[in-house]
Amino acid sequence: MTPLIFVTGGVVSSLGKGIAAASLASILEARGLKVTMMKLDPYINVDPGTMSPFQHGEVYVTDDGAETDLDLGHYERYVRTRLSRKNSVTTGRIYENVIRKERRGDYLGATVQVIPHITDEIRRCIDEATAGFDVALIEIGGTVGDIESLPFLEAIRQVRTERGAEKAMFMHLTLVPYIAAAGELKTKPTQHSVKELRSIGIQPDVLLCRSEQAVPDSERRKIALFTNVSERAVISCPDIDVLYGMPLELLRQGLDELVIEQFKLRDKVAAADLSEWAAVVDAVKHPLDEVNIAVVGKYVDHQDAYKSVAEALRHGGLRQRTKVNLKWLEAQDLEGSDMSALQDIDGILVPGGFGDRGFEGKVQTSKFAREHKVPYFGICYGMQAAVVDYARHVADLDAANSTENDRQSPHPVIGLITEWRTATGEVEKRDEKSDLGGTMRLGLQEQRLKPGTLAREVYGKDVVAERHRHRYEFNNRYRTQLEDAGLVISGKSMDDTLVEVVELPRDMHPWFLACQAHPEFLSTPRDGHPLFIGFVRAAREKKAGGKLLKEARA
């Protein structure tokens, strides 16, 4: 039976439960334990796939094609374990499962209720996702006191009651606000948050106290006294300059030791080696170079919509001790402009998106990068914009477009995928009338790279696998015509049916590459990703006047 650490949050949302949980997981992993993580989200959507990026932020895609909360991105950036749809559970999915069972007659005529049927299904999902690991960390979304979270909190209360403290730990993240006028930290919100938890039968074992500054020992003792938590289990989590330094901070305060002791894992663990995290922090704090990258997107007012893209760009810089400064630009604002917003930029990235708003701005951005020899990296919709740009302005296919934006286009160089093969070999189909949710080409897919191309050079191998999330794809009817006009198709699906990567010849442009996949989902601070490392390197070379630079590794 896998020991479980349940992570809850109180007082306010967005305190960083995911970062805190992932940081602890990375320490336990460094101590030799096999670790996994899980997110329980209280919203009624089955998954975030159809939610607005402005409301929810990024939809993070796993290898098996699950559309999940962006916190799973945090988890995979901190631990080596690759997660799946089992690791992301919503209220919507729980109710969907229970109602399906009720319709089948699985409950034998019983009245289906929150307790025990909903809570049992939550516990079943937890057991399924965590089996076979030495320890699992499970984050409960939302804030204690939210009505939506109650079934999840009741389920984890039951788990603790049945398994005991040696198999279940409660960790509560709470806010200790600093009141400038009084010049002091206030512990009362934390006391009330714990009181709320205790009212539903949960006594925290550990408190993580988020604050602008370190919580002094006197305040920690006060919190311990009023919350019935051991003083050494009241952990200070002050604001820090580098988030990837959080594992080092939690290790310093001995949070991992609390877990080892409570779960009696002493015989399984070794000393924690966090040298990789120390190297990451050092690279962030002591860069040798810096570049300015423009990100031209549709949802830049809510930058969490591009969380993995921003992190992957920074990771690409870390591998070269280069600080990456991001300039966020709204694609729609560039339509019909003189593109002066892209002056003094060392590289341009156009990320994914959906719908016609801002698409012409992305096409215009591709044209600017192509004509001005600025390194260009297109991802998903950014690749489709690059293809449309090339078709219109180089291949003379006037009014070329994507059928997503113009179904009457005389040259639909981008069209709806109606059939594709999944990573498991199954064939999936869809049409214009299919539901939006869960009907895209999703998950890890292999692709073969063309020898002698930029993509093959950057990746360093012939076959690579990337995660996908898209409905539209390069129209194969235009392959030959665009290749004859000079466009290089450097990556294709293994069955040769789908175009995965396009680029410009090196004699036409120093670094212009666009891919249909989402490589940002496989980038980590410790390893980076070949495409992002190559893109940042190209930006450095542009800044240096086109000189080849020797890569400085973190």
UniProtKB/Swiss-Prot annotation:
Write out the GO biological process terms: 'de novo' CTP biosynthetic process; pyrimidine nucleobase biosynthetic process
Homology family: Belongs to the CTP synthase family.
Q: Do you know which HAMAP family this protein is assigned to?
A: PyrG
Protein name from the UniProt record? CTP synthase
Reactions mediated catalytically: UTP + L-glutamine + ATP + H2O = CTP + L-glutamate + ADP + phosphate + 2 H(+); L-glutamine + H2O = L-glutamate + NH4(+); UTP + NH4(+) + ATP = CTP + ADP + phosphate + 2 H(+)
Q: Name one Pfam family in it.
A: CTP_synth_N
Query: What are the start and end residues of every segment in region (Amidoligase domain)?
Result: 1-265
Reported regulation of activity: Allosterically activated by GTP, when glutamine is the substrate; GTP has no effect on the reaction when ammonia is the substrate. The allosteric effector GTP functions by stabilizing the protein conformation that binds the tetrahedral intermediate(s) formed during glutamine hydrolysis. Inhibited by the product CTP, via allosteric rather than competitive inhibition.
Q: Which residues bind ATP?
A: 14-19, 71
Alphabetized InterPro entries for the sequence:
Class_I_gatase-like (IPR029062), CTP_synthase (IPR004468), CTP_synthase_N (IPR017456), GATASE (IPR017926), GATase1_CTP_Synthase (IPR033828), P-loop_NTPase (IPR027417)
**Where does this protein hold Mg(2+)?**
71, 139
Q: Which residues form the active site?
A: 380 (nucleophile), 518, 520
Q: How does it assemble?
A: Homotetramer.
User: Which SUPFAM superfamilies does the record match to this protein?
Assistant: Class I glutamine amidotransferase-like, P-loop containing nucleoside triphosphate hydrolases
The EC designation for this entry is 6.3.4.2
Which residues bind UTP per the record?
A: 13, 186-191, 222
Mention one GO molecular function.
metal ion binding
Its annotated function is as follows: Catalyzes the ATP-dependent amination of UTP to CTP with either L-glutamine or ammonia as the source of nitrogen. Regulates intracellular CTP levels through interactions with the four ribonucleotide triphosphates.
